[in-house]
Amino acid sequence: EAKLGLKFEHRHGQAYYTAQLKPQHVDLIRQAETSKSVLQLVNTWLERMPFFGDGQIWTGFENEISVEGWHPFWTRYRQLYQQSLASAEKENQQAFDLVFADKTEASADRQLSPAASRAALFIMLYRGYPVLQLPFQLLNGLLEIDEQLSSWRYRHMNMVHRMIGTRIGTGGSTGKDYLRAAADKHYIFREVAQLTSFLIERRRLPQLPIAMERKLGFAI
């Protein structure tokens, strides 16, 4: 979990996490927590998406009324997303800006930077293009890891409940309660999963410029 990207401060039962381990094993965990995690490497990879730095391939978007700090594509997409929201979802617009706008209050608390979040959402939106198929499968694989870990924790929780019921476990709380709380909190790639809240209908997606479509397609 530490190597994947679950930070110590995001764990449930932090005191119990290493209390039952031998010193040499605690040292191994500390080393894992201080080294680059999978989530950090994914963030760096997403930030390197090249397409938004080349203004020449974004013909047709130059006349967008630009919002300060936003690429013309994201200015248009932001408007389309706002139009897609139901009356009960209007607060999602603020969440959109917090996640994707540079230099926001939420940026410091998130492990994915705004640039990485925009790149991941772009991959999800246009995953039908050949160049984005493998990146989308990678992102989807990260979510499957979380799902499998959650499934394992749930089965483990049920096994502990059958074995000791509501007896106190080694963590000082009932074993079932500890495992349930850990299962609810330990989602490593939660920020990737939350990006689906910002999708719109595929038929309403902005049409990409021909030059961009060529870059995302098969080279002939």
Residue ranges of model-derived segments:
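Extended amphipathic alpha-helical segments with heptad-repeat/coiled-coil character used for oligomerization
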Residues: 1-60
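C-terminal accessory extensions/subdomains outside the catalytic/core fold
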Residues: 36-115, 120-220
